[in-house]
């Protein structure tokens, strides 16, 4: 494997093989790739677990629900393989119900409870934004601008909502670079399902093997593989403690800064 591009880590025995002849479309995950996941959403997730604990009348403490989704309120650590980092809210709720079956009618079927949870997430996020703003995952504007000017089609595929993703990108001044944004609520399901990535390819009239997926979790890797993407590029600054799926990626970068040069080299 070629690891001469600055920032590319070597991972043993990759199972992903590049299948693209020419990359025309680059599809990005949002949280953990474009935005700093901890700074943007951790407070919201913590608040949500406290609310769910209250729904059990305190039978289960917030810490129990935090453990299920892979976060720690005290240390502010996030499990890169956990449901908070990689799953959707539906995935998280299903696991909460496994712990406490009495939550099923509330979390899975009660529209008012789900509305309250969305409000908690957004209100806590807005408080975070007022305090620190949307926090990019390093310098993302420079590489995205470079890729945009190079003629690539750019899109976002996230397990967050489409509106939230659009707002976050607008907050940090990168929204004009993206031709399409797809969230879990855009009608194509969530990752690791392939429908969102396939829909983006269809929108631009290209085949999946002409697309590259850039992500930081098993959900991103799984979506790329299931859709038949030609290239997957992992983003993680914690190698070798990165998500297990990323260790199977053909390319692994610490952030987006090295992406333009990697793709330029890949095209030659």
What spans do the regions from the language model cover?
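Single conserved hydrophobic/aromatic residue that forms the stacking wall/gate
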Residues: 1-15
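Residue-level "hotspot" positions that anchor or transmit function at local structural transition points
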Residues: 4-5, 84, 135, 188, ...
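Asp-based, Mg2+/Mn2+-dependent phosphohydrolase catalytic module
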Residues: 14-26, 39, 54, 141, ...
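N-terminal helical cap/lid subdomain that shapes the substrate entry/recognition surface
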Residues: 23-138, 148, 166
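Conserved phosphate-coupling serine/threonine residues in phosphotransfer and NTP-handling enzymes
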Residues: 33, 158-160
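Short, flexible loop segments at the rims of nucleotide/cofactor-binding pockets, characterized by
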Residues: 130-134, 159, 188-189
């Amino acid at each position: 494997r070629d690891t001469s591009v600055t920032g590319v880590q070597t991972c043993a025995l990759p199972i992903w093989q590049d299948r693209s002849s020419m990359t025309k479309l680059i599809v990005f995950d949002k949280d953990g790739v474009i935005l700093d996941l901890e700074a943007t959403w951790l407070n919201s997730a913590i608040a949500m677990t406290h609310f769910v604990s209250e729904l059990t009348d305190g039978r289960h403490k917030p810490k129990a629900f935090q453990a299920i989704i892979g976060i720690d309120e005290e240390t502010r650590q996030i499990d890169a393989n956990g449901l908070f980092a990689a799953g959707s809210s539906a995935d998280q709720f299903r696991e909460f119900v496994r712990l406490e079956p009495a939550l099923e009618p509330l979390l899975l079927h009660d529209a008012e409870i789900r509305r309250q949870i969305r409000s908690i997430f957004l209100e806590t996020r807005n408080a975070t934004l007022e305090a620190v703003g949307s926090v990019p995952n390093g310098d993302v504007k420079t590489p995205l601008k470079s890729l945009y000017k190079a003629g690539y089609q750019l899109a976002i595929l996230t397990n967050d909502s489409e509106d939230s993703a659009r707002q976050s990108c607008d907050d940090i001044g990168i929204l004009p670079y993206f031709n399409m944004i797809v969230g879990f609520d855009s009608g194509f399901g969530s990752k690791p399902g392939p429908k969102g990535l396939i829909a983006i390819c269809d929108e631009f009239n290209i085949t999946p093997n002409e697309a590259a997926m850039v992500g930081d979790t098993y959900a991103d890797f799984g979506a790329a593989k299931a859709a038949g993407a030609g290239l997957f590029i992992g983003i993680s600054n914690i190698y070798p403690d990165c998500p297990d799926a990323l260790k199977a990626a053909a390319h692994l970068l610490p952030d987006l800064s090295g992406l333009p040069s990697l793709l330029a080299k890949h095209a030659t």
